[in-house]
């Protein structure tokens, strides 16, 4: 009797973990519109592994890059960069989850979407980029934060970060209007429903 109960509880526990994992994954994919004409998935961890970035042979090259960068930035910036290079998840982006790239008629900008692991870490990473004048200061909008950089708009909330390819101020303003809707979008209105 006890074995049967343990067996059933084990199956239930596995099912709960599976459902929880699925719901977390789909939350950030809800920003992908249902009418997306092209969607590509990129597995960053697999890509880094295949590129040999985890290999011991590349450790020396990584250290040389860090040393070269160290001379051109202040200590706090370098410390954050070194932390992210040694552990990419410190960037605030969940590198274990797929990154999706999409285009759609309703949001006609090439967009990459990644899962947020830590909104605070992402803010810290972007603040470093602001200090190094790589991007503009972070601003708040209707339910999300954003910054701009050369040819790109980065928008994020607590679950998703979007990198949108835009050209000029008029496209940035139009994209910002659409971002509000995408970040509030439910699974019913997203590609998650058709997946």
Task: Tell me what each language-model feature is.
Residues 153-174, 178:
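Charged, amphipathic alpha-helical scaffolding segments
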Residues 10, 105-106, 150-159:
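Short, surface-exposed loop and linker segments with low hydrophobicity and enrichment for Pro/Ser/Thr
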Residues 1-20:
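Sec-dependent bacterial lipoprotein signal peptides
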Residues 22-148, 169-170, 174-195:
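Structural boundary/hinge residues at secondary-structure and domain interfaces
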């Amino acid at each position: 009797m006890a074995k049967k109960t343990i067996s059933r509880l084990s199956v239930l526990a596995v099912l709960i973990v599976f459902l929880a994992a699925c719901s977390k994954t789909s939350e950030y994919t809800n920003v992908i519109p249902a009418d997306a004409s092209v969607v590509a998935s990129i597995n960053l961890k697999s890509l880094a592994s295949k590129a040999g970035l985890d290999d011991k042979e590349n450790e020396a090259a990584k250290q040389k890059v860090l040393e070269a960068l160290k001379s051109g930035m202040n200590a706090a910036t370098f410390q954050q960069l070194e932390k992210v290079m040694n552990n990419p998840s410190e960037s605030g982006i969940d590198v274990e989850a797929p990154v999706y790239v999409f285009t759609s008629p309703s949001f006609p900008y090439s967009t990459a979407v990644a899962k947020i692991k830590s909104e605070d870490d992402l803010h810290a990473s972007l603040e470093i980029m602001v200090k190094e004048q790589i991007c503009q200061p972070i601003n708040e909008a209707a339910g999300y934060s954003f910054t701009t950089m050369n040819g790109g708009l980065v928008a994020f909330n607590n679950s998703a970060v979007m990198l949108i390819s835009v050209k000029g101020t008029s496209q940035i303003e139009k994209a910002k209007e659409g971002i509000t809707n995408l970040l509030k979008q439910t699974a019913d209105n997203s590609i998650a429903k058709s997946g």
